[in-house]
């Protein structure tokens, strides 16, 4: 029994140590902006805008936050890769269209038909070349 308790304590201790070594994705610097903005700040801003624009309910907010987090992280990583390989407007636009289209598809599961229709209409105004 004493061995089991010791093993559990060690396991919990090591798992906490491992988690502490990985910085939160929200504290990571947003590469595209030079003003010190973090990914978390961008997520907060997009979530606030989507909440107002789509009239998200309290039940939809956690799932929407996850969708937005995935999209912002994917965009941030894509910009990092583009900077390393040579970035231009066409590549950046292609990345934005791909990430935003995927975000719209992920949103479909959590939005009502009215909310989704409004989102698709807004998306098609911004990205007419998109295939939603």
Named regions from a protein language model:
Residues 1-28:
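Bacterial Sec-dependent N-terminal signal peptides
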Residues 21-132:
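Charge-rich (acidic/polar
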């Amino acid at each position: 029994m004493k061995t089991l308790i010791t093993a559990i304590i060690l396991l919990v201790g090591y798992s906490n140590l491992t988690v502490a070594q990985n910085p939160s994705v929200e504290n990571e610097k947003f590469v595209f902006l030079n003003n010190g903005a973090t990914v978390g700040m961008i997520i907060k801003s997009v979530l606030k805008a989507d909440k107002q624009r789509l009239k998200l309910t309290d039940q939809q907010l956690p799932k929407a936050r996850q969708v937005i987090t995935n999209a912002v992280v994917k965009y941030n990583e894509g910009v990092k890769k583009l900077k390393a390989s040579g970035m231009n407007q066409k590549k950046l636009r292609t990345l934005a269209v791909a990430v935003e289209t995927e975000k719209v598809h992920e949103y479909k599961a959590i939005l009502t038909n009215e909310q989704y229709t409004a989102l698709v209409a807004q998306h098609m105004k911004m990205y007419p070349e998109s295939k939603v």
